[in-house]
């Protein structure tokens, strides 16, 4: 499944039945790419789980992040314009990527709920959770729970 001519590198990972890897993909040690999952032009750190029915394109998934069943990273805007990373917090800062294809960046230990869509240019900082069926955009600060666009709450300390 990993072809050097395609600039792919897979190190001690688990590529399951019917997974599809294309473009330049780096998949870290102990990661799982599951059934009916497509990986395209990604950097996937160690022990990441993309276990079933996912699409991850032009994205970076941090250490021990997990994409729930059916969750995807959308990597192209519907109007085909260049992707801009927009900070959804008070600053409203915008970073122009200069790219038409730019998916999402997930920090370490991010959990994405089933059937969620991470829109182009989404950044989810470390230790965050995304509720199932969410449509996420912008920057989600570290240690937060994304319930919906109007309800992004800090995690309670244990």
Label for each model-derived stretch:
Residues 8, 16-19, 24-26:
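Right-handed parallel beta-helix
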Residues 28-34:
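Surface-exposed extracellular loop regions of Gram-negative outer-membrane beta-barrel proteins
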Residues 1-11:
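Single conserved hydrophobic/aromatic residue that forms the stacking wall/gate
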Residues 35-158:
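Glycine-rich hexapeptide-repeat left-handed beta-helix
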């Amino acid at each position: 499944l990993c072809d050097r001519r395609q600039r792919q590198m897979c190190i001690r990972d688990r590529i399951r039945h019917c997974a599809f890897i294309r473009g330049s993909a780096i998949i870290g040690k102990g990661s799982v790419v599951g059934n009916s999952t497509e990986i395209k032009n990604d950097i996937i750190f160690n022990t990441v789980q993309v276990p079933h029915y996912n699409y991850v394109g032009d994205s970076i998934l941090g250490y021990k992040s997990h994409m729930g069943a059916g969750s995807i990273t959308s990597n192209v805007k519907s109007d085909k314009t260049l992707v801009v990373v927009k900070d959804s917090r008070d600053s409203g800062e915008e970073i122009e990527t200069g790219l038409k294809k730019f998916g999402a960046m997930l920090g370490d230990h991010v959990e994405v709920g089933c059937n969620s869509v991470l829109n182009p240019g989404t950044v989810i900082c470390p230790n965050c959770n995304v509720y199932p069926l969410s449509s996420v955009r912008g920057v989600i600060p570290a240690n937060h729970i994304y319930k919906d666009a109007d309800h992004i709450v800090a995690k309670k300390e244990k």
